[in-house]
Structure formats: structure tokens, C-alpha cells
Swiss-Prot record:
Record feature DNA-binding region, as residue ranges: 19-114, 196-288
Gene Ontology MF term list: DNA binding
Cellular localisation: Nucleus
Lineage: Eukaryota, Viridiplantae, Streptophyta, Embryophyta, Tracheophyta
Keywords for this protein: DNA-binding, Nucleus, Repeat, Transcription, Transcription regulation
Protein name as it appears in the record: B3 domain-containing protein At2g35310
CDD domains reported in the protein's UniProt record: B3_DNA (cd10017)
One cellular component (GO) term of this entry: nucleus
Disulfide bonds: none
Length: 288
């Protein structure tokens, strides 16, 4: 009986094994950041380490992450880790604790830089989960399609697109009023009163994270941590990028470095961001 009791206690202790991480935006996707501590890993069998980790947050969302191995240590697979980081808008020195609950299931507790625990998902994540794409009348192009079409034109050009917006029928009559408005753009660098946009010049440090001037921050950006979806103009590639606010400063953090490498961006480029939704942008790049 005593031996069984000791075995049960050992199993319970193993279930409660835990480790922590402090997330720094510069190396948030590195193997070292994704590494599992040696003292933590050695209490698990090879069979257990061949399974996926299932990470569950306080509000119920969960993520599955493969476990990989190099000659020195075990670590969390990159795409699963980056999905977890992006969904939770992490990358600004958050303190995370991972607690094993058995069968490679983990709970994660996320503490912000100010010491407060995150008890609900970031605003944009809950917004995206609850929202649906708006319906469009047949034959009317979306703004995203309009901007993508512009980016494929060459040299100087001028496009004028008419959008029709039908007003709802009045309750006492069947008259319908059509509103017609147009969006004119002279070139890829021209501004439009109908499209919110801003431009940034790429410096070397901006290939890792992009800091915004106060003028852009106050006019265009949210006042809290948010996940932005940034599209390539051809609309075939997009990136989830974390926008973080730290005091009076703000920047694109987790996910931005990957975008800069894959787009790709280079020092001297001019980046123009055009809004197509509240937290969704198209990125146009002009080379020097």
C-alpha cells in the first residue's frame, strides 16, 4: 500500500511540473526561446516527448504544438509556437508559466509587463472570432480588391471606381435612393480621403520591429495591444503582426520580423500601409 501511495504521489508531482518564459520581442521565435528546460524534460519519457503539447489558456482557448529535438535540447516547433504568440499578441516582456496537467496537456498563465495576469484574449482575437465578413452586393468590388488591382498597374495611372450604396426601403413607401461615390487615386503614392493610410521609411532597426511616430500613433493606431493582419498587395500572402503600446511609444512587434524577411523589406524602402478594415492593412513597398 505504501509503495502504491508513493507512486501516486510521484505521478501527481509530475503532473504539476512547470516552467516559465519571459518573452523578448527580438528573439521571440528563436530555438532558445522555444526550448524546454532540461530539468523539466528529463522527467518525461521519449514516448511522451514524441506527442504534441496541448497548451490551454485561462479563458479556454488551446493550441497544439509539436515537440522537436536538436543535438542539445528539446524545443517547441516554430509554427505552432508562433501561432500561440500571435493569437495572444505577445512579445513585450510578458512572463509566462506553463504547468503540466498530465498527458502533455499544459495550462499557461500570462502575466503582462505591469504584473497583471491576462484573463481574457486580446481584443482583436475575440473580435475576429465573433465577426463575419460583410456581405457585398453582386458586381460591387471590395476595397481590398480595388487596392490590389491598383498595385498591379504600372507607372502613372488614374482609376475611378464607382460604388453604389442602396438605402433601405422606407416603411411607408417602396422608393429606393442610390448613393454614388467615387475613389480616385492618381498613383501608388497618392493619398485618398476615402482610404486611411500612412507611410514609414525603413531604417535598419525597423527590420526587427517598427516604432511609430506620435503622429501615426495618435491618428491611426489603437490605444492597446492589438493583432493586425497585413496583406501583400497581390492578396496571396498575409501576416499576423502584434501591435504593442509601451507608455507613450508603440510598435509592430511579434510577427513583424518574419514579414520583413518574407516580403522582403530592405533598408531605404518606403512602406505605405492602407487600411481595409479596422485592424487589417495592405502594405505597398517602394524601392529607393
Amino acid at each position: 500500500m505504501a509503495r502504491n501511495s508513493d507512486n501516486d504521489m510521484c505521478k501527481e508531482e509530475r503532473k504539476r511540473e512547470s516552467f516559465f518564459k519571459v518573452l523578448q520581442r527580438v528573439d521571440i521565435s528563436s530555438e532558445n526561446m522555444r526550448a524546454l528546460p532540461y530539468d523539466f524534460v528529463r522527467s518525461f519519457s521519449n514516448n511522451e516527448l514524441s506527442r504534441k503539447m496541448k497548451i490551454k489558456a485561462r479563458w479556454g482557448s488551446s493550441w497544439e504544438v509539436e515537440i522537436c529535438k536538436n543535438p542539445r535540447f528539446y524545443f517547441m516547433e516554430k509554427s505552432g509556437w508562433e501561432k500561440f504568440v500571435s493569437d495572444n499578441a505577445l512579445g513585450a516582456s510578458e512572463f509566462l508559466t506553463f504547468t503540466h496537467k498530465g498527458n502533455m496537456r499544459f495550462t499557461v498563465n500570462i502575466f503582462m509587463q505591469d504584473g497583471k495576469e491576462m484573463l481574457q484574449p486580446p481584443q482583436s482575437m475575440s473580435f475576429m472570432a465573433s465577426s463575419r465578413p460583410p456581405k457585398r452586393e453582386q458586381g460591387i468590388p471590395s476595397l481590398a480588391t480595388t487596392i490590389a488591382a491598383e498595385s498591379n498597374g504600372g507607372g502613372n495611372y488614374k482609376r475611378k471606381l464607382n460604388f453604389e450604396k442602396k438605402k433601405a426601403e422606407e416603411s411607408h413607401n417602396s422608393k429606393r435612393t442610390d448613393k454614388v461615390f467615387s475613389v480616385q487615386r492618381e498613383s501608388a503614392g497618392a493619398s485618398s480621403s476615402s482610404v486611411a493610410e500612412f507611410s514609414m521609411f525603413i531604417k535598419k532597426s525597423y527590420l526587427i520591429y517598427m516604432w511609430f511616430p506620435k503622429s501615426v500613433q495618435s491618428i491611426h493606431m489603437p490605444k492597446q495591444r492589438t493583432i493586425f493582419k497585413i496583406h501583400h498587395p497581390n492578396m496571396k500572402k498575409s501576416w499576423n503582426v502584434v501591435y504593442v503600446v509601451s507608455g507613450t511609444k508603440s510598435s509592430f512587434s511579434a510577427g513583424w520580423k518574419g514579414l520583413a524577411q518574407e516580403y522582403p523589406l530592405a533598408v531605404g524602402d518606403t512602406c505605405k500601409f492602407s487600411f481595409i478594415k479596422q485592424h487589417e492593412l495592405i502594405l505597398f513597398v517602394s524601392k529607393p
